Each structure stands twice: as structure tokens, then as C-alpha cells.
Amino acid sequence: MGILWIVTTQWRAQACGYADDPNVHTPNLDKLAIESVDFTQAVTPHPFGPFARAALLTGVPSPENKVVDYFDPLPDDARTIAHDLNDHGYFTAFFGKWHLSKRNPDAELVGEEHAKVIIPPQNRGGFLFFEGFESGFLINDPWLHGTRLETPTQFKGYQADILCERASAWIKSEQRPWFCVVSLEAPHPPYASNASGIKPVEPESLQLRANVPGESKIASKARTELAGYYAHIEATDRAIGKLIADIPTDTVIVFTSVHGDMHGSHGLFRKGWPHEESIR
């Protein structure tokens, strides 16, 4: 039996078809939700990525897990879910965004420097197989390295498509009980980046949440960003759907996001706020 844990970035819980968002197209997640338990009141352990990822992997919140600053690495001796499942006979694998290794705080957050950081084996959280990247927010043409790729190698295409395809191939090759994390950067900014052929809708056609101030610059900015945001959600939903269709039907699937995005709700943007759109 296998366990698949899909982790996305900045995908708020409200932005799904099954959650009654009128703007979004998520047929694969909608189908999964019908067959699943939906934890409607679950919130992130922290509304910023590294802190949430460290807590999700270790079960220990910040600062107790020693990830105190945005650029703090997960300590090499931190015990994660991978260690526990290794001990119980599972073969553990991680694909995608790590965001818990040492990186240059002065480098551009969006770009190749963080994307090409090599995560040393002792800093991969105990996963027996690893193929991913530190950060960089390269939603297209990601750089991957790990167990089979000693140096960062660029793959052409949409990040979610590439990671889901490579995770699927690994899963299909496994005969042992397995645990696989697929960690995707989408739908994190930059929202204007290509969304695997999904064309953004016209911003003016979008229905904003009731708590977004009406006729204002905030509403205009929210519409512009949401057009790209929803395109990336649709593209990521499609990649996830292909992955789920490829793997054994008895797989236990967990889907979550490390945090959401305000998108103009209460006049605010991005994450880090103690509001529903940011924490759930």
C-alpha cells in the first residue's frame, strides 16, 4: 500500500470548486473531495512557507523545531515523518520544493540562485529518495537534483506537470510499501507566469469575495492577480488528476497547502495574516 501526500503553495482552501468558488475549475480535486474526508476547520501551523513545512514534516511547531527565521534550515537531526515511516518498513520519497535548506538571504527570491541550491543528503529530512529543489518559484522549467541527479538539471515544462510525472514513474516502479511527498510551488506568485497553456480569464469577469473592498485599487489588483492565480490552480489540478489516475487505487491520498493568499480580502494581500484566506 502507498501513501501520497500532495503539498501545494499559497492555495487557499476557498479556491476550489467543491468549496463553492465560482471562478475556479478544479474537477480532479472536486472528485477527490467527494471520496474523501474534508477537514474544513484545519489551519496551517504557520502562514509562511518554511515554518509551515518544518511543522508539517516534524509535527513540531516553530520555534520549537529550530526554524525561527525565514532562512533557517531544518536541523540535520530533526526527526520527521519520513524517519517514522522508514522505521515501519515504508520506502520514503520526496519530489519538489524543499524550502528548508541553507540558502543565500540576499539572493532574489524568484530566480535560479535558490532553485539551484544543492540540498545535502543529511538535510533531506530522512527521505530515502529525493528529487527536488530548494526554492526559486520557477513555476516553469524547474531545476531538479537529488538521488539520481547529482547536479541541478533543468527540465523544460510546467513544474507541476514534471514533478507529478516523475513521481508517478517512481511510484509505479515501487513494489514495497511507499510514502511519497509531491511538493508543488504553484499557485504561488509570480501569477503572470505561463500556466501550462491555461489562459487566464478576464479579470473583470471574476467574482470577488464579499470581504474585498468594492470599487477600489484593491479590488482591481485582486482581479488582476486572481486571473493568473486561478489559471495556475487549474493547471495544477490537471497535473494532480493525471498523477492520481496513474497510481494504484488503494493509495491513501492527502492533499493540502502550506498557506493561502488574502487576494484583497480585508484589504490585504499575500499570507502571514491571521485571517481565513491566509491560514486555511
Features from the language model and the residues they span:
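Loop/turn elements at helix/coil->beta-strand transitions in domains of secreted/extracellular proteins
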Residues: 1-3, 37-40, 88-91, 128, ...
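Active-site segment of extracytoplasmic enzymes that catalyze sulfate/phosphate-ester chemistry
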Residues: 5-6, 12-93, 104
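Short amphipathic alpha-helical segments and helix-helix/interface helices
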Residues: 29, 79-82, 120, 171, ...
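Short Gly/Pro-enriched turn/cap motifs at secondary-structure boundaries
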Residues: 34, 45, 121, 133-135, ...
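Acidic, His- and aromatic-enriched active-site or binding-groove loops in soluble protein domains
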Residues: 110-135
